[in-house]
């Protein structure tokens, strides 16, 4: 069975599955800080309930890694898809032909040393884009802002990126395309200060799931406007692309949802998510920015809403880019006919993305599909260059050209990335649970068991409604997760 997991970090999108970031005072980030800001772990994910807590998307706290250092320096395809929105009118950040990026949590983004190291990585490899945390699942806004609601709820009290315009200037000079990640419905600051913005409990007050998490109400237009105002602010600074994470309903068990009510409810959950995405796109259109969304990886295969309001056909034509989190570690045993999904990164990613390509082909004006890929270890085998490169190769073999790597601590496997000038030798990738030269991948893929497409979709639908993949304890993850 498959289990829907999100990144996250959220909701990463997210992109977001482990999107919990440790709150740290001051300019330094101690090594003990749990920097799991995953994109709504959204992701693909089919998780085994026996090994995973909640949805990697939601609050999956992934690794205890230092995101910054002492003395942080604040300066710092579907057939014929619709072309994404153009870059900002000032032309500082032309969109790359194909976005190939990495995620930078807010602490890393605010550290001159970490940014320098990641710019050097990009200069030596195919990486051309950085996803920057503007607001993660902690609710704090990373940069100084005077937005009234942000000030009112205390979202301005933990600045991680002191000079966001300066950071954008550095990325501009380096030829890096910046993407602003903004988490929506998981925001403990906003839900605490304005409980009427949250999902409500039939017994009165804000509703909380069985883990005590209070979720914002996706039907609430004030919630929409708060995040659109933040997106507008960073777009005016120069960001050419806004990436919404945790753009969904809570993925709590049905027993929890029995008490939940949604003031302002109008239409289905999928209608609400579509309405927000369409609204945000229209509101930001004059700025010429692309509007994108992190979604559970399961959405590429599941044929119905699994309770979170994300249905592929419902959102793919109101975003410029959809980013499904297809992390192999998040798939349930038996997904796509594979007993140990994490050991088959090539097969899992290729199967999930082929479903996305097929479904987008039937939708006029479908946005681009750009997956979040796993660059962290969660269970065996350990994810190193062969496992990460296998996912990138699978993305290309599914007919897509773009991807973003997720690691909550923003530490990436350079050997998995194509160097400037190309690989000198055939890269080794994991296919069929073996390490082989990439050119030999087709010799093994035919031996991997598979299940019929309709059965796979049914299994995903069933598992997604029975297991919650919202967070993963830090001590269960090796190297980070999202």
Task: Please identify what each model-predicted range represents.
Residues 116-140, 235-241, 321, 395-402:
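Catalytic domains of carbohydrate-active enzymes, especially glycoside hydrolases
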Residues 125-159, 251-258:
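Aromatic-lined carbohydrate-binding/catalytic grooves of carbohydrate-active enzymes
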Residues 90-103, 107-109, 169, 180, ...:
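Active-site-adjacent "subsite" loops/lids of carbohydrate-active enzymes
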Residues 111-114, 120-127, 170, 212-247, ...:
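An active-site-proximal structural segment forming one wall of the substrate-binding cleft
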Residues 319-331, 345-350, 355, 359-446:
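Substrate-binding cleft of secreted/luminal carbohydrate-active enzymes
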Residues 12-15:
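Bacterial signal peptide processing site
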Residues 263-295, 299-376, 422:
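Glycoside hydrolase catalytic-domain groove-lining segments
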Residues 8-10:
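C-terminal motif of bacterial Sec signal peptides marking the signal peptidase cleavage site
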């Amino acid at each position: 069975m498959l289990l829907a997991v999100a990144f996250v970090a959220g909701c990463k999108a997210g992109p977001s599955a482990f999107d919990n970031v440790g709150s740290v005072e001051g300019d330094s980030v101690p090594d003990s800080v749990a920097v799991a800001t995953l994109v709504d772990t959204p992701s693909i994910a089919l998780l085994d309930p026996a090994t995973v807590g909640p949805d990697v998307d939601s609050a999956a706290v992934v690794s205890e890694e230092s995101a910054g250092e002492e003395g942080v320096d604040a300066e710092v395809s579907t057939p014929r898809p619709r072309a994404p929105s153009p870059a900002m009118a000032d032309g500082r950040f032309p969109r790359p032909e194909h976005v190939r990026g990495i995620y930078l949590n807010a602490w890393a983004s605010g550290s001159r040393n970490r940014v320098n190291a990641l710019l050097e990585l990009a200069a030596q490899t195919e990486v051309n884009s950085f996803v920057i945390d503007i607001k993660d699942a902690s609710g704090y806004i990373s940069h100084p802002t005077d937005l009234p609601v942000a000030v009112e709820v205390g979202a301005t009290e933990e600045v991680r990126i002191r000079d966001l315009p300066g950071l954008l200037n550095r990325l501009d000079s380096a030829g890096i395309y910046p993407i602003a990640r903004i988490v929506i419905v998981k925001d403990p600051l906003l839900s605490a200060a304005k409980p009427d913005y949250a999902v409500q409990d039939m017994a009165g007050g804000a509703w909380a799931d069985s883990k005590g998490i209070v979720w914002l109400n996706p039907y609430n237009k004030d919630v929409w406007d708060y995040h659109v105002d933040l997106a507008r602010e960073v777009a005016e600074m120069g960001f050419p692309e806004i990436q919404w994470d945790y753009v969904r309903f809570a993925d709590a068990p049905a027993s929890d949802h029995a008490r939940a009510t949604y003031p302002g409810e109008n239409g289905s959950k999928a209608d609400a998510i579509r309405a927000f995405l369409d609204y945000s796109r229209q509101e930001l259109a004059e700025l010429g920015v692309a509007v994108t969304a992190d979604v559970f990886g399961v959405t590429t295969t599941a044929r119905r809403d699994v309770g979170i309001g994300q249905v592929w056909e419902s959102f793919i034509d109101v975003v410029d880019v959809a980013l499904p989190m297809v992390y192999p570690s998040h798939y349930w045993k038996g997904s796509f006919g594979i007993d140990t999904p994490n050991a088959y990164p090539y097969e899992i990613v290729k199967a999930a993305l082929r479903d996305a390509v097929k479904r987008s082909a039937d939708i006029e004006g479908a946005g681009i599909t750009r997956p979040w890929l796993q660059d962290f270890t969660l269970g065996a085998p350990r994810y190193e260059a062969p496992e990460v490169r296998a996912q990138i190769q699978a993305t290309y073999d599914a007919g897509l050209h773009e991807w973003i790597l997720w690691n909550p601590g923003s530490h990436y496997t350079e050997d998995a990335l194509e160097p400037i000038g190309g690989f000198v030798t055939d890269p080794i990738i994991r296919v069929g649970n073996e390490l082989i030269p990439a050119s030999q991948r087709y010799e093994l893929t035919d031996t991997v068991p598979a299940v019929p497409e309709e059965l796979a979709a049914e299994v995903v639908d069933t598992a997604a409604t029975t297991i919650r993949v919202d967070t993963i304890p830090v001590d269960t993850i090796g190297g980070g997760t999202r």
